Amino acid sequence: SAITAHNRRFFATSIACLGAVLISTSAFAQTPNRSEADPALLNVLNQPLQSCSQAPQTGYLRNGYCAVTTQDAGVHGVCAVMDAQFLAYTKSQGNDLSTPNPKLRFPGLKPGDHWCVCAGRWQQALDAGVAPKVVLAASSKDVLGSLFLDDLAKHAVDPPAHLPPPKLP
């Protein structure tokens, strides 16, 4: 069934997200800055992917975009607007995004910052009632393999006038 398939995708993404935390911070320390996304990359609305944040610089590749690559096992494709509830929740789940880590050039996040988060973590936060707001224009279409567009749209700071119809497999 569709729900079972969704649960399998969510479980796989959640496990990958947990394992990707160290990989992502390692990539951050080694990846050169890039200021533009590939024009072929699309957001959840099937439009060109927009920048999530340049300050702090976010994204698995730390280029400001929530582009998902084959190396990004955690699917860091959701452009989320940090708030105190989500920062506390993700810290309680083992991913402290609020404490600076100068060794990794990580400034620590505060409420209002935009950050690319794992699709699985966003779903966990949604299930726990603490999902942060999202920027649909800056969230990768790749997250739709494990998240529902309707759920993202309900938390959007940039809700569309209408949602594109879902594509059937």
Regions found by a protein language model. Name each.
Residues 98-105:
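Short alpha-helix capping/helix-loop boundary micro-motifs
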Residues 122-145:
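Short, compositionally biased
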Residues 24-26:
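N-terminal signal peptide c-region/cleavage motif recognized by signal peptidases
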Residues 32-85:
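Extended boundary segments
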Residues 142-169:
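Glycine- and charge-enriched low-complexity intrinsically disordered segments
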Residues 2-15:
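Bacterial N-terminal signal peptides that target proteins for export
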